Amino acid sequence: MIPLTPLFSRYKDSYLLYAFRLIDLLRASKSAHLTRLLSLQATYLYHFACLIKYKDVQKYEVQQLIEWAASAPPDIDLQQFRVEFMDNTAELNLRSCQPKSFMYTFTTIWDTIHFLSLIIDDMVATREKSSLDFVAQQLKTMKVLFYNIFFILQCAMCRDHYMNVKGYIIYHIERIDVALEKERYGAPITFSESYCEETIENARQDTQDLEGPPTKRARLADTLEHADSTTAANVLMRNLMAYVSMTFHNHINDYKWIQRNQKPPLHQERMTWVRYKKALNL
């Protein structure tokens, strides 16, 4: 269960606004394939919103909302679409899916990325309450959501950059996939409190380096033997995706000065894992 902190509450509100802006794209879509893709994503987002708000999936009501958005006139402005959205969600008893604020900024997108990351971590932590198959299916959908975030980025430079670096997030979701699969076949997940890349395979590869001096090969062999005997077979960082989304956010903030060809500020603030965990009560 994710602790209900002020920061997480903000993330939830941003998530609802993100979902609203996603269904707004439906009325402008001129491609049947894109419309179907956006509809599937919006359906998933609102199903999840219903689970959070009502503890139940309002399938019929969500379907009606998505169908309304897809058939809304493409020439009405966002303000009119917002008014009709409020009317439709009220009529469908989906008032709790209405965002508290419609002020859409980059923070909305970042909050949604962090929110989805926390949801993934919670699914992994509570996997025994559902099933590995269920969690694996949710991760598959989450990868699609992260992959397609570029749809809603209104800055061309940001969109291009996200297309280049989004694999960082998806890679870590697949690491969770691998950990769950290992657990399925008898290697329970052991949670670590810190992030570390796998080093055992690197050690194995290095021991095969015949050009290295004998002392180096012996030292690597000792390292490998120690790692095999002391390291759990299936280790995953606790709250991995929260950590990944934080480091991803820090990187984007660092790299934007290169994109702008500007000198970064002397005292640019970066989030630390200790502070972030404290803000989320993890």
Swiss-Prot record:
One matching Pfam family: Baculo_p33
InterPro entries: Baculo_p33
Top-rank lineage group of the source organism: Viruses
Keyword annotations of the record: Early protein
Family designation: Belongs to the baculoviridae p33 family.
Protein name, as recorded: 33 kDa early protein
Species classification: Viruses, Viruses incertae sedis, Naldaviricetes, Lefavirales, Baculoviridae
